[in-house]
């Protein structure tokens, strides 16, 4: 969310632009209403790398876009974009028929702000990569399951629409929690410890399986999880889930009793994926 404050004596025109690079090596970018979609043409819908991004806005100003930056050599694409943005009142449409290699696309909103007034422009970026699999165990890579958000939303456009429609509630509830935590009488060191460890549950350290159950790594490497299995010697000492989201904590215990306990009552300390794997 970007805010423009016009302190001039006359009305001014303001433009805000959001640029995204399509991560697909063979992809296409597509404008639909107030959205830019970043699609892949390389993979089938049941492939682990199939998916899309969606960049959207709910602004009521003048919307322009470039589905593609100029495909040139060296830094031609960036230089051409900057000239387009600074020298034109609105972006001129640029499209290519052939799929590209990680093309950039830009969504832009232009608004008139009266003297002494301000305006806010919202953008939201969502993704939808529905298929997950055990990439660290080759013998099980043929078994896939859905990420939980793929059960809730059928594509990135749906989650973008949800995010914009519920923006004020989601932001308000998050800010209220943050404000009350930092306004509490707890010692500063305790507040820091709570906030630092709490942030882990919104990272890729945590997965939600197809039924919504929680699965966690011990930590993360740059591009992979580190030490699988919601292991008990890490997650049994975590307090965020049981105190803030007890149903999610309970899902870990339910999985343990269903998949990790043997006929003698002994329980393994790692949950292996796919579920039910020996």
Regions found by a protein language model. Give the residues of each.
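Acidic/polar, glycine-enriched structural segments that form the non-catalytic walls/loops
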Residues: 4-231, 248-250
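Helix-terminus loop motifs that line ligand-binding clefts
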Residues: 236-278
């Amino acid at each position: 969310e970007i805010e423009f404050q016009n302190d001039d004596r006359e009305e001014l025109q303001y433009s805000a632009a959001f640029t995204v690079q399509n991560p697909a090596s063979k992809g296409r970018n597509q404008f639909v209403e107030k959205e830019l979609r970043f699609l892949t043409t390389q993979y089938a819908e049941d492939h682990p790398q199939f998916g899309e991004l969606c960049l959207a806005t709910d602004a009521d100003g003048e919307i322009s876009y470039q589905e593609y930056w100029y495909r040139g050599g060296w830094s031609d694409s960036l230089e051409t974009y900057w000239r387009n943005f600074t020298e034109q009142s609105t972006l001129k449409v640029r499209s290519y028929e052939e799929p590209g290699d990680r093309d950039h696309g830009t969504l832009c909103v232009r608004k008139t702000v009266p003297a002494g007034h301000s305006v806010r422009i919202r953008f939201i970026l969502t993704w939808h990569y529905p298929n997950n699999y055990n990439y660290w165990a080759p013998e099980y890579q043929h078994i896939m399951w859905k990420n939980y958000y793929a059960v809730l939303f059928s594509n990135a456009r749906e989650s973008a629409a949800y995010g914009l429609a519920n923006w004020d509630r989601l932001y308000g509830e998050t800010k209220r929690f943050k404000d009350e935590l930092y306004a509490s009488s707890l010692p500063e060191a305790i507040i820091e410890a709570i906030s630092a460890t709490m942030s882990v549950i919104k990272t890729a350290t945590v997965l939600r399986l197809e039924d919504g159950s929680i699965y966690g790594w011990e930590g993360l490497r740059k591009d992979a999880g580190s030490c699988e299995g919601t292991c008990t010697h890490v997650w049994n000492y975590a307090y965020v889930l049981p105190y803030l989201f007890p149903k999610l904590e309970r899902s870990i215990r339910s999985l343990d009793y269903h998949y990790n306990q043997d006929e003698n009552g002994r329980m393994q300390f790692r949950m292996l994926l796919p579920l039910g794997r020996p």
